[in-house]
Amino acid sequence: MLNKLCKILFFINLLLVAVQSYASPPPSLPAAEIDTKDKDVSSNSDISFFDKFKQFFSKSKKKNISPKQPNEQTKAANQEEPKLASQEHTEADASEPFIDTGNTALPSVTASNEHENSVNLASHDIQESNETEASKPFIDVGNTALPSAASNDVHTNTEHENSTNLASNIITPNVPRPIVSMPPAQAGSYVVPPQRPVQIYKPTNLPPVHKPIPLNPSPEANKEEESVAPIAPQSIPNMPAVSPPVVSPPVIQDTTTPSTMPTTVPPAVPSNVPAPPVMPTNQPSTQPITPPSPNTPVTTPSKVVPTTDSSAEINNSQETFVAVSDVPKKQDWNTPLIPVVVVKPNQPQALEKQVNNNQTTNNQEKSPPVSSSNVTIQKQDDKVNNETSESTTKFVKDETQMLLLPDDDIVLGKLTEQATLEQMDMYAYIELFQKKEEWIASAKRRKVVESFIKYDNDINKKKDIYANLSYCKAVDNAFRAVDRNNLFGLRALLDVYPILQEKSRSGETLLTAAIYNDNYYLAKFLVIRGIKISTLNDECQYPLDIALAQGNANIACMLIKAKGYQ
């Protein structure tokens, strides 16, 4: 039994070692952590059952170590106890934030055998704690100076300092401890504190919101458009063209010969309603198909009222007749409108006769005659035109009286003066009479005021006072204005009378008269108005010759220039 138990324990140890080798992270830097709790304070409640199981087998393994150096084992055991307590404390406080404690002394690496044994024992415990911390994030220490190799004296001094620090520390709850201790400060060296990693976000290329429309779309886009296109409505197959049915005139039977088979009349088909499609059949039709004419009247069924004759047999259930209605239900736009004649209310019979005459003249075809004299046909009355209410009839009578009264008081929607006076009361009539009297009394003063306001209505500002003279006197006044150098008077006369080319009694023209007076402005004005330069006077002299004889160089140059244009 003992051998079996040993084998079982051996296999369990092998499994644990294999699991630790696969699950343990890479070895961390050697660091001595400071424990702020006593050995008795640390509770075993935070340690899981699996960790306790591993510790049990690890302790049993430590007991088998050969006691080669008893002093070294005691020292290692003394160093192992605070490290185990610190490992338990770090497992509970691993979630707390990192706090840098500054320059903390780290144990220097020595080449002595004592330190190597202690490191080996501590590394075994560190591997056990790393299994629980494998899932936690890796903390980068940063640019931390590693401890340098030193002598045994330096190591003993640092151990003594750490022991004094542990004794002086006070246990404070919820105070985080440094995870990594800093090396001792030496002359000429400094420690760089760890820096928090900065996350750099790279810009992402977002897709454009509006895609550019290509000039030449790809065939794939056309396929997409075709797939998105709306579904076309189902096309109805074309029915065979069939002419509309034609209603043939019925055969009228005499009442004296009773018939056993009733005659059926097809219903009336209005002109504006399309005929329903008729499915073709293999049976030939007995009636010929004729195209309907647009002037064919609409046939409607009517009731038959036979006369009560003793010699004729009455059978209303078997005889039906068709009559043409005189008044159509709907007005056709191709036919002329029927004029409405309004007469006095005491002549109703004449109105009915005139309307009936107009209706019979507008209808192109009449109803077919009935052979039997014993049958009377009742015409279908128009409900819209004939069946009127009492209020409509009264309104028509009132309108007739208003339109056809000889002494009408309404003209273009306004009451006449006589009707206004008749509807006035006494006070309004007296006030109106006083206004009219004042209007008549102020007629003279009103004329004076109007003449003062409109004093210039009969005066044409482009005319002169000589405009009212006769044509002959106008010519004399024109030459008189030239002699007096009156340019404005001459202009007013020329605007009214066509006297530009006229001559005076002495045979002079207006241009020669202006040259004799040496009036350059009058001569230029006449040339601009279009007077003839080549006209001779009674002495057979041209205007240019007179200007040269008078020695007026300005008029001569003006005439020479103007002669080239005439």
Curated annotation (Swiss-Prot):
Coiled coil: none
Signal peptide residue numbers: none
Compositional bias per record (Polar residues), positions renumbered to this chain: 101-112, 365-378
Pfam families documented for this protein: Ank_4
Entry-linked Gene3D superfamilies: Ankyrin repeat-containing domain
Protein name: Putative ankyrin repeat protein RF_0987
ANK repeats: 506-535, 539-566
Record InterPro entries: Ankyrin_rpt, Ankyrin_rpt-contain_sf
Keywords associated with the record: ANK repeat, Repeat
Keyword Ribosomal protein carried by entry: no
Bias kind Basic and acidic residues: ranges: 78-92
Low complexity composition-biased segments: 296-308
SUPFAM superfamilies named in the record: Ankyrin repeat
Region (Disordered): 61-118, 276-314, 355-392
